[in-house]
Amino acid sequence: MNMLIKRVIAIKNPRGDDNNNNKLSDLETLTDKCTTCPLTLMRVMAFFVVSFMLFSVLFSLSVVLRDPPSDAAISSTTTLFQLNQGLGSDDFDSVELLNDKLLGGLLADGFDEKSCLSRYQSAIFGKGLSGKPSSYLISRLRKYEARHKQCGPYTESYNKTVKELGSGQFSESVDCKYVVWISFSGLGNRILTLVSAFLYALLTDRVLLVDPGVDMTDLFCEPFPDASWFVPPDFPLNSHLNNFNQESNQCHGKILKTKSITNSTVPSFVYLHLAHDYDDHDKLFFCDEEQLFLQNVPLLIMKTDNYFIPSLFLMPSFEQELNDLFPKKEKVFHFLGRYLLHPTNNVWGLVVRYYDAYLAKVDERIGIQIRVFDTDPGPFQHVLDQVLACTLKESILPDVNREQNINSSSGTPKSKAVLITSLSSGYFEKVRDMYWEFPTETGEVVGIYQPSHEGYQQTQKQFHNQKAWAEMYLLSLTDVLVTSSWSTFGYVAQGLGGLKPWILYKPENRTAPNPPCQRAMSMEPCFHAPPFYDCKAKRGTDTGALVPHVRHCEDMSWGLKLVDN
């Protein structure tokens, strides 16, 4: 430092006269005294750095204590879901915000993120997977994606299959085999059956093609990279898909009943009728002997409104593969649903706007899904009584104090947001008014919200189904869930969210049941119409008592569901 000062002075005084030399001498003396200056400056700088860091920590603590962050969402200032500015912000490249956007390897990388924002943004809500998928499942999904790319619409293999389908002549060896899923029934049923059909395709090395129906492309993103899963508009059988039934000559059940095809004959395609009204011959689909016949058929057309996966777990030919794919049996729909089902940007906008406005900044989110199977839309007092009896008895919601106007508890109250979904607004209004008119006994602040109330189910209306899909997804983002018996709407929400819900028993004679609800054994949906047949013994049997991981459902005594051993 001394040499630097001397050089500066030398430049300023090139003549070097005596007067200036005296000044230089004085300055040299001064600089000699400042040899310890760097140490002093360093100490001062260190003091300011430490002070700044301490201030930052104290400021952060004050923010956290004043407004505790939610476990399941980031604050509205960082959700980045400003739809009017475009959902596809580059800020989503941040590793911290994405929070393992690939869900532990379940999802494939390489998609155009802006085309389907929900695929990678769902992790922002803190709703990662409930558990870790097996490495075998992940590897099989990657292999399936490669097969789908090789065999998908308009590939060489697909074009060959379509050509042979038109001629009725199939070569003995085909590179690709297909299962075509027919869009059928309500949205909840369609979601459950879509996952069922995909698992069947995975088990049988087939490629899944999805009938777009009237609205599937408006609801769901493409799940597989580089190839569509939707049946092309020029598929030869498109005009017949909605007409197939049990009387069709290509129906598997009718083929067995009439013995119209021998084992040596391979039809160009077979129609599988697996809907709730299927008969005993149709149900033989779940026997290994019939799978041996079907494995040679190049194209299977499937119509179902049932989540039939539990019965696949009872088939010896699939047993080992399923055990390897899903060591935890209750997470089949959870893993496959999170892999396959990504809301389109329109639906995702509904989800994030509502979540950010009403659910993001609370301590706990509670979902209550009310479905009444009655010709009268309601609301019904006995249903309201049952909902309140369940939620208060199980301490899901706090009771109210009808004797006081103001709660006198001190401290920062805990906040709860209650999301109610129902075709009627009556239940929402009653619960909302209760928490408006009276304080809670616990001092908690309870907000009641309902996104829509359509009055009745409108299966074929596009925006109705978009809102229904958004509400299922919102329910899946809650911390505690209450669902209605028999409802596929609730099954989808619990499965996607990895939640074991409290299930409201189905009322009889318009009377609230006692007890009002029961905790689910697992997060898996219920198969409402399973077969009760022992394929090996060729006689009827209780299929809910054959293996430890397939049991009868809580809400439907004859149904089947997967549970952990």
UniProtKB/Swiss-Prot annotation:
| Enzyme kind, highest EC tier | transferase
GO cellular component entries: Golgi cisterna membrane
Membrane topology type = Single-pass type II membrane protein
Q: What is its EC number?
A: 2.4.1.-
Q: Any idea which GO molecular function terms this record carries?
A: galactoside 2-alpha-L-fucosyltransferase activity
As given in the record, the signal peptide range reads none
Record localization? Golgi apparatus, Golgi stack membrane
Keywords associated with the record: Cell wall biogenesis/degradation, Glycoprotein, Glycosyltransferase, Golgi apparatus, Membrane, Signal-anchor, Transferase, Transmembrane, Transmembrane helix
- Looking at the record's lineage, which domain of life comes first? Eukaryota
Q: Which residues lie on this side of the membrane: Cytoplasmic?
A: 1-43
Q: In which pathway does it act?
A: Protein modification; protein glycosylation
Q: Which residues cross the membrane?
A: 44-64
The segments annotated as topological domain Lumenal are 65-565
Instruction: Set out the biological process GO terms recorded for this chain's protein.
Output: cell wall biogenesis; cell wall organization; protein glycosylation; xyloglucan biosynthetic process
Q: Which InterPro entries match?
A: XG_FTase (IPR004938)
Please list the residues annotated as glycosylated.
Answer: N159, N263, N407, N509
UniProt-listed Pfam families: XG_FTase
Q: What does the sequence similarity comment in the record state about its family? A: Belongs to the glycosyltransferase 37 family.
What is the role of this chain?
Answer: Involved in cell wall biosynthesis. Adds the terminal fucosyl residue on xyloglucan side chains.
Q: What is this protein called?
A: Galactoside 2-alpha-L-fucosyltransferase
Origin species, per record, is Pisum sativum
At the highest ranks, the source species' classification is: Eukaryota, Viridiplantae, Streptophyta, Embryophyta, Tracheophyta
